[in-house]
Amino acid sequence: MTDKPNNDQRSDLTLASRRSFLKHSIIAASGVALFGGMSLGMRSAAWAAGGDVETSKAKLGFIALTDAAPLFVAAEKGFFAKYGMTEVEVLKQSSWGTTRDNLVLGSAKNGIDGAHILTPMPYLISAGIVTPNNQPVPMSILARLNLAGQCISVGEEYRDLKIGLDSTPFKAALEAKKAGGKKVSAAVTFPGGTHDLWMRYWLAAGGIDPNADINTIVVPPAQMVANMKVGSMDTFCVCEPWNAQLINQKIGYTANTTGELWHNHPEKAFALRSDYVATNPNAARALTMAIMEAQQFCEKAENKEEVAKICSQRKWIGAPYKDIVDRMKGNFAYGTGKVIENHP
C-alpha cells in the first residue's frame, strides 16, 4: 500500500464518516480503562512481581526517533521483565507505513502487537482509513509517550531568509525556485500523521497551499537528512535526532519547534492491537507499567546523558551521541544563532 499523500487519500482523511471515526476513536482510546482508579503506587505494587500475565510475549515496533526512548529504556533496564513480560521484542521498523502494515498483520502473522506510533495512526487504523481495502483493525492507546518535541527544518539554501515560525518569507523563495524550473518539496513521515499536520498548518499560515504550491512527499524519518543533502526536499518535519543532525552536518537549520505551533500538543503514543488487549489485559497492563516506569527514568535530568547513549546504539536509533544529547536535555540550538535552553 502506497503512503504517498495523493488527492484520493486526502479526500479519505477529510471526508471519512464522522460517526465511524468517532466510533473507532472510542475503541482506540479504550486502553485507559485498563487502570481504572488505581494510583501509580498501587499499580506498581500490583505488577512488580509480574502479576498473573496471560502471556510474557509481545512484539512492539518503533521508529528510530528519540521519543521512542521509553521502549528502549524499558528493554535495556529490565522494566518489561520486572512486570512479568520476559519475552518482549522491541523491533525497529523502517517507516510508519511498515509499522501500519505490521500492526495490520499482528504477531500471529509475523507482524507486531503494538508500537511507538504517531498519535493519529491508531485512530486511522481503527477506522480503516489507512489500511488495505479500508479494513478496520481496532487499536487501543495505552499511554501518551510524549508531548511536542518535533521540529520543522529547512535547507541551507534558505539560510539568509532565517525562516522561523512565520513561513511567509518561504513563499516567495519557493515561487522563485519554481519559476526557474525546479521542483519544491516538503517532506513528512506519514499521510495524516502529526508531522503531516504540523507541516501543512505551518505552510498554510504563510500563504503556501500545501496541496497546490509545493509537492508533499513521504520520507521515513531516518532518511530525512540524506534526502535533504541531495536536494530532494526544501523542508521537512520530523522528530529528533534528525533536525539536530541536519544542523551538525551543515545541511540546514530549524525553523521552529512544533511546540511553538501548539504548546504541549500530543505527539507519539504507545498503542496495542485491541485483540491483544482483550485477550491479554494483564499483559497489556504490565507492558504499560514498564513503559511508564521507563518514562519516569527518562524524565530525570540526571539520566538524560545515559538515555542519549542508549538511544545512540545501533539497534535503537544508531545516530551519533552528539546529535541526540543536547536536545534531549532541552537545549535547542536552531542553527541560526537562536538558542533555547531548558526547553521542556
Regions inferred by a protein language model and the residue ranges of each:
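Short glycine- and hydrophobic/aromatic-rich loop-to-beta-strand nucleating segment
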Residues: 152-153, 269-272, 276-277
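Signal peptide processing junction and immediate N-terminal pro/mature segment
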Residues: 39-49
